Amino acid sequence: MTYLVLLLGLCFVLGGLAVASNPSPYYGVVGLVLASVAGCGWLLSLGVSFVSLVLFMVYLGGMLVVFVYSVSLAADPFPEAWGDWRVVGYGASFILVVIAGMIVGGLIECWKVGVVTVDSGGMFSVRLDFSGVAMFYSYGVGMFLVAGWGLLLTLFVVLELVRGLSRGAIRAV
């Protein structure tokens, strides 16, 4: 089980690196799906099945829509592939940053955080992840509204930036 969790953590980091160093939106989707599956599998191994399922639905439902939209706007006839030197350089530099962060974190010893599973507090009638979701929606209403307005503003800003001189892949007829 330990090796499975370590493998899921490695896949999560590699998926994040693939999203960060993607040469085109076509390949960014692969990294996003890898990171999403690995992160939700990691949460599932800790016993947080409901939150893992909700996050999986949100990531693959919402973020793939964004990637499909960006793919339709970036109609490259010859997209950059993973083997290009610029993409390999980005990936190598991101891996070096992650390794340096692990070394510095190990030297400072700030990683003294224990992993607690959902059922570790004893016997409860309601699992902790379900009660956490209820608190998430009851006490977090203001933050949800602020995050929703922020995402709406971000959508309009991105649409305005991408529009440019209306000479993109999608043109008004």
Curated annotation (Swiss-Prot):
Name the Gene3D superfamilies on file. Answer: NADH-ubiquinone/plastoquinone oxidoreductase chain 6, subunit NuoJ
One term of GO molecular function: NADH dehydrogenase (ubiquinone) activity
Where does it localize?
Mitochondrion membrane
Pfam families named in the record: Oxidored_q3 (PF00499)
Annotated InterPro entries: ComplexI_Subunit6 (IPR050269), NADH_UbQ/plastoQ_OxRdtase_su6 (IPR001457), Nuo/plastoQ_OxRdtase_6_NuoJ (IPR042106)
Reaction catalyzed? a ubiquinone + NADH + 5 H(+)(in) = a ubiquinol + NAD(+) + 4 H(+)(out)
Into which EC class is this enzyme placed?
A: translocase
- Its primary localisation, in coarse terms, equals mitochondrion
Recorded E.C. number(s)?
7.1.1.2
> Which keywords annotate this record?
Electron transport, Membrane, Mitochondrion, NAD, Respiratory chain, Translocase, Transmembrane, Transmembrane helix, Transport, Ubiquinone
Q: Please state which protein family the record places this protein in.
A: Belongs to the complex I subunit 6 family.
**Purpose:** Core subunit of the mitochondrial membrane respiratory chain NADH dehydrogenase (Complex I) that is believed to belong to the minimal assembly required for catalysis. Complex I functions in the transfer of electrons from NADH to the respiratory chain. The immediate electron acceptor for the enzyme is believed to be ubiquinone.
Protein name per the record: NADH-ubiquinone oxidoreductase chain 6
Q: Which organism is it from?
A: Calidris maritima
